[in-house]
């Protein structure tokens, strides 16, 4: 039996599908309020019966974690909170850091292998030969978002478990492209691209297909002597190039007008003050705006060296759209 946390999300739901394809018995730990739209639509898309064993519980509750792990040989820890609102700092810490600490301790106690879905947010600040790699040094916590710090501290808990003898695999995906609970997480980027954008920021980021993340998380966990982080990046693209793909594939509005950085940073400064006072009128945060202008480039050489060939961003978008159309017609 294999346990998956966070199976309601993009990565977790895809890992469940890949495990079921491989004939594994899968148990899913979920909160009472869990929404399984993402997993249900994938099961429908792949024409697979729902043979998942669902167990109600929470990673914040060590007792329910221990009960969920009973009889399991492995856990894929995908559950995490993503938010860039300063008001969510405490919840980010409780979910991402304390929750992961609980998972690590439960795995140590039950002698269960752990596969941890981390993030590029934990990759160090200093590029090596123009790219951020698994070896890029982390210079400082200063200026980092609460989300970034929560993922870093969570990952440190995983490394702590490793030092205590836990068998661990860590993957660090970029912006994950794939079907999920529409209107949440990175599906918002897909829906925005499908609608089309005229204006675009000057930043860039690394993108990866959710299927690649699931396949690599599973395959890496089966390898001997797998150490450290593993960046999962299909392509590095500017946001202009990324949203242009939607125009080329689906006929969406083509991004054609660059938004200058200077006036946006003025908005960022004002928004930061309002956020501290909890008076911000916008859903978009100052951190969202800042990230739109960061030029992030990541290396996938570690995965290329083991022979893995990533899907392209175009393949990821076409796949996501196929599932999206199925959901609309459901």
Report the location of each language-model feature.
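Conserved Rossmann-fold NAD(P)-dependent oxidoreductase catalytic core, especially the SDR/UDP-sugar
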Residues: 90, 98-146
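Glycine-rich NAD(P)-binding loop of the Rossmann-fold in SDR/ketoreductase-type enzymes
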Residues: 60, 91-102, 149-150, 208
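NAD(P)-dependent short-chain dehydrogenase/reductase
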Residues: 162-170, 174-207
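NAD(P)H-binding glycine-rich loop region in Rossmannoid oxidoreductase-like domains
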Residues: 48-95
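Active-site Tyr-X1-5-Lys
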Residues: 143-169
């Amino acid at each position: 039996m294999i346990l998956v946390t966070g199976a309601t999300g993009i990565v977790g739901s895809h890992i469940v599908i890949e495990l079921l394809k491989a004939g594994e018995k899968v148990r899913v730990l979920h909160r009472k309020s869990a929404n399984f739209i993402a997993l249900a639509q994938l099961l429908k898309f792949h024409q697979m019966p729902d043979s998942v064993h669902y167990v109600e519980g929470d990673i914040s509750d060590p007792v329910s974690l221990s009960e969920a792990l009973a009889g399991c040989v492995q856990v894929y820890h995908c559950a995490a909170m993503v938010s860039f609102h300063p008001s969510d700092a405490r919840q980010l810490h409780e979910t991402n850091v304390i929750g992961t600490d609980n998972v690590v301790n439960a795995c140590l106690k039950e002698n269960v292998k752990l596969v941890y879905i981390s993030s590029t947010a934990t990759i160090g600040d200093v590029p090596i030969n123009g790219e951020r790699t698994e070896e890029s040094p982390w210079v400082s916590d200063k200026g980092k978002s609460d989300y970034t710090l929560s993922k870093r501290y969570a990952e440190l808990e995983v490394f702590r478990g490793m030092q205590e003898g836990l068998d661990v695999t860590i993957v660090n995906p970029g912006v994950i492209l794939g079907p999920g609970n529409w209107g949440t997480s990175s599906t918002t980027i897909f829906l925005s691209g499908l609608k089309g954008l005229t204006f675009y920021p000057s930043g860039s980021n690394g993108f990866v297909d959710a299927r690649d993340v699931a396949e690599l998380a599973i395959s890496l966990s089966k390898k001997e002597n797998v150490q450290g982080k593993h960046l999962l990046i299909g392509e590095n693209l500017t946001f202009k190039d990324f949203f242009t793909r939607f125009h080329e594939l689906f006929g969406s509005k083509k991004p054609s007008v660059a938004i200058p950085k200077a006036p946006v940073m003025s908005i960022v400064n004002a928004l930061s003050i309002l956020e501290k006072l909890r008076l911000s009128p916008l859903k978009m945060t100052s951190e969202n705006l800042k990230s739109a202008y960061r030029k992030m480039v990541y290396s996938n050489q570690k995965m290329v060296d083991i022979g893995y060939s990533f899907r392209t961003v175009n393949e990821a978008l076409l796949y996501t759209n196929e599932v999206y159309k199925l959901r609309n017609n459901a």
